[in-house]
Amino acid sequence: IKQLRIYPPENGTCDLIVIYEIEEPEQLSQNGHYLSIDLGLHNLMTCYDSGNGRTFILGRKYLSLERYFHKEIARVQSVWYAQQSERGIKYPKSSKHIRRLYRKKQNAVKDYLHKTTRWIAEYCRKEDIRCVVVGDIRNIRKENDMGHKTNQKLHELPYNKLYIMLEYKLKLYGIQLIKQEESYTSQCSPLSSEVSKRYAEASNRKERGKYITNG
């Protein structure tokens, strides 16, 4: 252990940060075996193993966690604001119960992401996968308007945390992580010579997965 950091109590709890040094493993040489990960809204991670052709989905529980806490927080807020309104308080502060629910939600999501990314790292080590390719969709959220509800869900998804957790866990085993830009991939036809804004705007996409081409 190199360092211990104790942060002052906040909302009744304090943070203890333990910093320790580990020997960084060398990156493994590529063997042509990779795992590709497609990040999504309903299925957080859809994975494909190039070695055995296996496809599996991880992260279905994430939206259930989000829905549960959103519903519970909304219920508690409704009761709290009604009580404060009866007392003549027009703009009440958030209650301890509400703040506790937000912390509980944050911890539950963080724990779930850690467990999911740990499972992927262990799977790659077991199957001798030396490269993981994951879609980088952070810019997609900025460039597209998919409606209020969908936009809200997309912005709440902790993609950046997921990237960081996955990257350092894979790095401990010498496994490379590649982030693949995914802008315009859904608008371009599979027959397009390249994936770009120009081809996306020219694409005659009728519906999801259906294109009309001249080829």
Regions inferred by a protein language model and the residue ranges of each:
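Well-ordered mid-protein domain cores that form the structural environment of catalytic cofactors
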Residues: 1-7
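Positively charged, helix-rich recognition surfaces that bind polyanionic ligands
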Residues: 8-215
